[in-house]
UniProtKB/Swiss-Prot annotation:
The organism's place on the tree of life at top rank: Eukaryota
Annotated Calponin-homology (CH) domain residues: 35-157
Single Gene Ontology BP annotation: regulation of cell shape
Protein name as catalogued: Growth arrest-specific protein 2
UniProt KW keywords: Apoptosis, Cell cycle, Cell shape, Cytoplasm, Cytoskeleton, Growth arrest, Membrane, Phosphoprotein
Induction: Down-regulated by mitogens.
The protein's role, per its UniProt record: Required to maintain microtubule bundles in inner ear supporting cells, affording them with mechanical stiffness to transmit sound energy through the cochlea.
Composition-biased stretches (Low complexity): 189-198
Protein's gene: Gas2
List of residues that carry Phosphoserine: 184, 188
GO cellular component terms, semicolon-separated: cytoplasm; membrane; stress fiber
């Protein structure tokens, strides 16, 4: 069993007196959680479109809408091939997507290209909740929403023979496991790991490393327990955890994904601070599983972090 927590003695993190640094740190955490999704989608787009896209250039490459229109046209061609081979149960949109390929970033034409892509997504069946605003792409204001939209497009496209992004492949893998496997019994003592010994499994070792950083020193510990390959009990929940491209440890949460490190920041009480609205004082969360009803209305929770100076926060 892997247990992780922060000792109150060594706990550090931005408080109300450090709100500027805290805001910067929080933004860096959001970006860190988004990075695996960007990398996965960049690789998917590169393979589909033959244009090199990276996580670093993701929004910049897409922001004039031209590559998205090209993506729609490419996916349509693959749909047509699938329809010729198998009669689909649903009629798919096959139409010319108006696009100005040379549209400057930030221009009206960039917005028009993006709007045309979004219109095509609606025709395809992408739910309104998965779409982004044209401005959100053009002005780089909604990177997460752009990623979620493309993932949903990948899910739909995969039904018609289009190679999906890596995260969608992992979703299919989990769905198959849930369909084929019966409920697993409680793990035997031999399935629990402790100390620094390596399990020899890349995923298990990565989960162990993340859950034990920083080292646990609290008497009441938040536990991460391996139940079976890729299946863990984290706190009070049983979760599927996967390694994306042998690099990122991802948790299947609801209908989406989150980094394991990001999940722990939100759900491990030992990684949170309780801040008083009255005097601004911070204190550790004492409850093993804090809920809003357990908290004083004059307090609120923030995640804790090792403090970084402003110049160190990227």
């Amino acid at each position: 069993m892997m247990c992780t927590a922060l000792s109150p003695k060594v706990r550090s993190g931005p408080g109300l007196s450090d709100m500027h640094q805290y805001s910067q740190w929080l933004a860096s955490r959001h970006e860190a959680n988004l990075l695996p999704m960007k990398e996965d989608l960049a690789l998917w787009l590169t393979n589909l479109l033959g244009k090199e896209i990276t996580a670093e250039t993701f929004m910049e490459k897409l922001d004039n809408g031209a590559l998205l229109c090209q993506l729609a046209a490419t996916v349509q061609e693959k749909f047509k091939e699938s329809m010729d081979a198998n009669k689909p149960a649903k009629t798919l949109p096959l139409k010319k997507i108006p696009c100005k390929a040379s549209a400057p970033s930030g221009s009206f034409f960039a917005r028009d290209n993006t709007a045309n892509f979004l219109s095509w997504c609606r025709d395809l069946g992408v739910d309104e909740t998965c779409l982004f605003e044209s401005e959100g792409l053009v002005l780089h204001k909604q990177p997460r929403e752009v990623c979620l939209c493309l993932l949903e497009l990948g899910r739909i496209a995969a039904r018609y023979g289009v190679e999906p992004p890596g995260l969608i492949k992992l979703e299919k893998e989990i769905e198959q496991e849930e369909t084929l496997s019966a409920p697993s019994p409680s793990p035997s003592p031999s399935s629990k790991s402790s100390g620094k010994k390596s399990t020899g499994n890349l995923l298990d070792d990565a989960v162990k490393r993340i859950s034990e950083d920083p080292p646990c020193k609290c008497p009441t510990k938040f536990c991460v327990e391996r139940l079976s390959q890729g299946r863990y009990r984290v706190g009070e929940k049983i979760l599927f955890i996967r390694m994306l491209h042998n690099k990122h440890v991802m948790v299947r949460v609801g209908g989406g994904w989150e980094t394991f490190a990001g999940y722990l920041l939100k759900h491990d009480p030992c990684r949170m601070l309780q801040i008083s609205r009255v005097d601004g004082k911070t204190s550790p969360v004492q409850s093993k599983s804090p809920t809003l009803k357990d908290m004083n209305p004059d307090n609120y929770l923030v995640v804790s972090a090792t403090y970084k100076a402003k110049k160190e926060i990227k």
